[in-house]
Amino acid sequence: MSQKVKAAIIGSGNIGTDLMIKMIKYPQNMELAAVVGIDPASEGLAMARERGIATTHEGIEGLKKLPDYAEIGVVFDATSAYAHKVHDEALRADGKLVVDLTPAAIGPFTIPPVNMDEHLDATNVNMVTCGGQATIPIVAAVSQVATVHYAEIVASVSSRSAGPGTRANIDEFTRTTASAIEKVGGAAQGKAIIILNPAEPPMIMRDTVFTLSEGADEEAIRASVAAMVAKVQAYVPGYRLKQEVQFERFGDNNKLKIPGRGEFTGIKTSVFLEVEGAGDYLPSYSGNLDIMTAAAKATGELLAQRIIERRAAA
């Protein structure tokens, strides 16, 4: 009997299909057993069938009818926040672990290199947003060596890589990401901005992270950021620093005012990132989508490893 944990993907659009290709190309602890959609003509479902993976276009009810359903341990949801609430209730009732790629955020915000170890026993984990996956590791890196009073991220993504869901949920993106900057990144106050870049040919994802901190020197911050970038690169090879980390000091004679928090003295750190997609299914400029699917897969692998360990101990 295979030691691998069977997994399913709900959602056969761009995100679900890219995740499917990653799971097939880079197998570790999981075996993809099913892909679920609602459109029988979906390209994602057709690609899954071509690869010998069970499919259904009848949504979660169709998944539950598949012969392997009882053996599935991990389910990825790449649909919508509204649909996820229904899926989550049904899946957890059947003992499945759920990785949520929607904005529903029923489970805890999860950034693999930052706080995955805290959520290995969670039954539902949320992948925040693409901007969150790219930038919160950097905020957390600064927080590990300093007290971060304020963190602001600016995510610039190709307009062509932003589908109707992203466009309809810009406000939700900024709120969710800002909340996770605080809850996961460790900043006392967080702010997020997203820019849809219309440039042609499309530009890869670019992110800027600003932090205002005290209690650490520049070298400690620089080293912590470099270590965190290496951790993210382990599952997103196209994630990299665009240039050297920049620092600016504010002392008693040139205090910086933080809206809502008063005057600040300490170090302003500016980190410039770019994220190039792996090109598994989505084009390489869609680094914003690639980092979501890569982070979801990395999270699923850790959850699956936990299941394998429990089986061995039983």
UniProtKB/Swiss-Prot annotation:
Tell me which Pfam families the record gives.
AcetDehyd-dimer (PF09290), Semialdhyde_dh (PF01118)
Q: Where does NAD(+) bind?
A: S12, G13, N14, I15, S161, A162, G163, P164, G165, T166, R167, A168, N169, N288
Reactions catalysed, as given in the entry: acetaldehyde + NAD(+) + CoA = acetyl-CoA + NADH + H(+)
For biological process, the GO terms are: catabolic process
**GO terms, molecular function:** acetaldehyde dehydrogenase (acetylating) activity; NAD binding
Cite the entry's keywords alphabetically.
Aromatic hydrocarbons catabolism, NAD, Oxidoreductase
What residues sit in the active site?
C130
Report the family membership: Belongs to the acetaldehyde dehydrogenase family.
Task: Spell out the InterPro entries in the cross-references.
Answer: Acetaldehyde_dehydrogenase (IPR003361), Acetylaldehyde_DH_C (IPR015426), NAD(P)-bd_dom_sf (IPR036291), Semialdehyde_DH_NAD-bd (IPR000534)
Leader sequence segment? none
Q: Which organism is it from?
A: Rhizorhabdus wittichii (strain DSM 6014 / CCUG 31198 / JCM 15750 / NBRC 105917 / EY 4224 / RW1) (Sphingomonas wittichii)
* Oxidoreductase as UniProt keyword: yes
Q: What is this protein called?
A: Acetaldehyde dehydrogenase 1/2
EC number of the protein: 1.2.1.10
